[in-house]
Amino acid sequence: MSVADLLARWRSNPQFMNKVAAWRIFPGSPAVYAPAPPSLHPALQGALAACGIQQLYVHQSEAVEAALRQENIVITTPTASGKTLCYNLPVLHTFLAEPAACALYLFPTKALAHDQIEELNRLAKAIDAVDPTARLAPSIAAYDGDTPMPQRSRIRKRARLLLTNPDMLHVSILPNHAQWADFLAGLRWVVLDEIHIYRGVFGSHVANVLRRLQRICRHYSATPRFICTSATIANPTQLAERLIEQRVHQIERSTAPRGEKHIILLNTPLVDAEKGVRRAAVLEAADLAAECIDAGLQTIVFGRSRVAAELLLTYLRAGLERRRSRPGQPFPAGNQAVPNQTFVTAEHVQGYRGGYLPAERRSIEAGLRSGLVRSVVATNALELGIDIGGLAAAIVCGYPGSIAATWQQFGRAGRTTDAAVAVLVATAGLLDQYVIRHSEFLFEQSPEHALIHPDNLMLLVDHVRCAVAELPFHRDEAFGASPYLADVLALLTEQGEVQRHGDRFFWSGLRHPAREMSLRSVGGEPVIIQQVEPAGEGERNAPCVIGEVDQVSAPLLVHDGAIYFHGGQSYQVQRLDLTALRADVTAVDVDYYTEAISDSEVKLLTCHAGRSAENSLTAWGDVAVHAQVIGYRKIKRTTHETLGVYPLDYTRRTLETSAYWCEITPAVQQELEVAGLWFDSVNDYGPNWVEQRAAVRARDRGRCAVCGAPEAPGRQHDVHHKIPFRLFGYVPGLNEAYLEANRLENLMLVCRGCHRRIETAGRYQTGLDGLAYLLSNLAPLYLMCDPGDLGVYVERGSPIGRAAVPDARTHAPRVFVYERVPAGLGFSAQLYDLHETLLNAALESVRSCPCVHGCPACVGPVLDDQPLQLQTKRLTLALLERLAA
């Protein structure tokens, strides 16, 4: 069945069409050609002809001409538009003109580097055939963590064109630059592929690595030029210039041919309209993928997290296994990979994501190219430009977190002139539903800005350490455009890590600091996930490493008792050892997955900027975030119901970072309180509270009613209201409702850990909670960051006129959206500028949502027993109407 046949079947199916929120057809277009620049080396022109390339696309010719003028360029044409030739041609031209010239290609992943080397070798061999004296092919090499040690010295001696990633440049090449002296002295070009990936923490690290590279190049009297490529974002030129700290020329108009592409935005059907409950997106996406596979279309399915990808793989394989006993769709004619295979089975559907070992990834990539693998379920590891052939369909399960990533995933289908289809299956979450309702965000100008902050002091100090270990600093030397070099060198000198002799600064450590830091996070070395045999099962096999996770994420993803997915198999974490950086897991067969529960508290340190409106104050500044993983939920796979909540007790961590916040004025609080729409002040428990609290402690004999833990010396347990105090409607001076609320039957003594778990698992959501949910979920649409890059915290306010301390402003009700990176990366300042835009988007989201009391698509999930006076949607809407006025 062709793509057109499948689309016709979908169009004629009313059930399917009822789920379609948007269906956009992008017609195919022919190529627009231009001759190769006449200044291009004749041997290279002959090699292009030998490879069947008689002429270039116009944008390729423009890019090559700009590069040959020695301009830095950034190419932002779409996926499959021939960006590779835009940088290969000027690089190889330079090689032919200058026998000592070298080039460095940096890719964000190892897979991309290995993929590109094949095309490079093909072109280099064609050049060598035209001009045997060139001998370019032997000088091209990939250099990464998978490169065997015996090959590395040979590569250092022979390579002129090196394909690697920023991590290897950081940890292997720059610290050992003396061994690369000839290569660095001849460095003429640096290619940065997929620079939209270089944002946030990773991008800020990479910008500093490039500062170190350019500094070492100057030491060897080299001044390389840069060629960058990027997906569609709002600020590609700004990002490129921030990364390399030089001016760049943008090439953005594509003249490559393209086939017709259908983009479908699909909303999962409502199961309970009143509660806003929708069918699980993973089930909908798995069904769509199975339909595409049955139609004979090679299909890629994207999940936006490891857990989602592995759930999709499990559901898709299970569905194929159920059909195994009856004939299925044959493989496409001409596929020799499986000549005797008559139907697709579970073995032909593979997973692919970060954390898989290199051999697994290479095997899957080869299977996709050969056609043996009919479908792959991936995270964003395959959203990049790896050449895995012409996939006909892409199913994207859940909004990937950025518009650029969405189009990258759409672009995996239709990398030829054939017709293709890509479907975005929305989850019930707020961001997904907002994008589904506002398709202009996808189909018109992207609002996303990729932000980096190379001068984040935490990162800058680490990279100055590396730089001074690589080459001593002179007093008057610069480190890129950073204004803080002198301060950082003074700090390192004071700490004894750097010694000053006259006008020069020298590294005094024994080890190179690059080995002690990762570019992918601020969490240091990763936590290794290893499979172990269950205890007491006789002879035990040696542990087998099956994946890894960064330290910051480890308590959230591989805590004790967590279910970890890999290759469609469930594993249960037996023990997480954060000291040894190891998580031991065993294979299990369970029908649930897990979700960590964390508790946090935010303290305001410094306000950098703020402005007042009639009903609110907005600001951004520095905060301290105290966070702890305190438990986890078991959630049934099929129904997504919570099966149980279990305690954990990991070390409380403090993060000093930046935050944006919105503070509610006393006037708004008072207006909402009078209307019965404000439940976000800290409770005044009434005049008998001290007496009742003491009575509960005596009754329960100082032991937690949940876990039985006794009170520690000098630290009392908390007293918890079983029915929330605020539901009794106590107003001091007007009624005595506190007497009913504070009955001993409604009170229980609980330790602080159990209290946090009770509050987190079952606390009713208020208007501030709804506002927090909206702001934190909408922010990534404008920031081009992952939702996990931001945290949110609600600070309850003191009752009007009854502040706990004289400085009432420190106890005003606030919603903080904070960055999960030490010192921040600039997101908070951007959110501060976007405050009114965010409020209006939040108000529109609540007003347009069809649910009654609140749901994940607007103010967040609400409890089934949420009292009528605490309808989160009603409270949030009332608050937003005043804030956005």
Which residues fall in each region the model found?
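Compositionally biased, low-complexity linear motifs
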Residues: 72-78, 126, 310, 733-739, ...
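Extended, highly charged accessory segments
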Residues: 225-228, 426, 468, 475-555, ...
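Short Cys/His-rich Zn2+-coordinating modules
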Residues: 681-692, 727-737, 836-842
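Short cysteine-rich loop/turn motifs with clustered Cys
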Residues: 688-720, 751-753
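Short metal-coordination and nucleic-acid-contact micro-motifs, chiefly zinc-binding Cys/His arrays
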Residues: 697-701, 743-747, 851
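Cys/His-coordinated zinc-binding microdomains
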Residues: 708, 755, 859-862
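Histidine-centered nuclease catalytic patch
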Residues: 708-749, 758-760
